[in-house]
Amino acid sequence: QAPDQQPGFRSNPWWVMVQEHAVEKEFEANDWALERLKHGASGLLFYLYDHQYLPRILRDIDLRYIQLGLVVEGSGPEVMDALLHHAHNEILPLDQMNGFLNTDPVEIAARTGHWDESKMYDLGELSRLAPPKFKYMCVNANFYGACGASASTQLGLALAHIDFYLEAFGEVGLEQYWLALSAGTHMFEEMAKIRAMRLLWGRLLETYGLPQVHLEIYTETSIQHQSALDVETNLLRAASAAFGAITGGADALQIRPYTAVLGANDAEAERLALNQHYLFAYESF
């Protein structure tokens, strides 16, 4: 097995340092993105509600050098088509685009109580449209963590979630799987959880008789572990969660701002969250 198939290894030496933004006004989102990139973020995650605004959001951003994440409630193929048009207009080689388009039928059904079969057809269409390094088989197991699931419950539900897609799609899109987990403050438990997930992924592929491929794991520090009464201490909570995720081998990590529990957009809190990435990177050099 290649080293990145072993528990505790990520596909690249450094994790992707992600920051997120819910798009309300496209030009404000673009200003935010350029500012975050200026401060050193290597991954941008957008919650997107209208694919028509995508070129405005991505203006002056060179997608060859960052990981782009798009969380979509509407039509995934329409958003992917808009992204491909943007890449064509920017003369951007598709094989140099890195990121994911997140439209997860199972998580949407769990969150809303409504199963939409058309979302499964969207995944089939994305298998035709998506660039080779752009993930689209997304498993949002962080939703279960946000609902209060323990580490073992998160793993069990994530595995069932992946199994559903493997049963439906088989080897189609096998290299395009992307898993989101939430990270709590028990750092050793988080290390073990991510490493165990890689072992379970390998065992599941073996059971289906499928080739061993790398599973992209994205982790975000949990808001459920933040305090609304003493928000500054959330920096310490985030540090414990992030340390566990990084040491466990997460490919990408979002450290949530210490004010996230208040639902506030705070530029200073975002800056400090990004600085925590730098501290971990510096200390592990």
Where are these regions (language model features)?
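Catalytic alpha/beta active-site cores
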Residues: 1-186, 190, 208-216, 246, ...
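ATP-dependent phospho-/nucleotidyl transfer catalytic cores
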Residues: 203
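Histidine/acidic residue-rich metal-binding segments in metalloenzymes
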Residues: 200
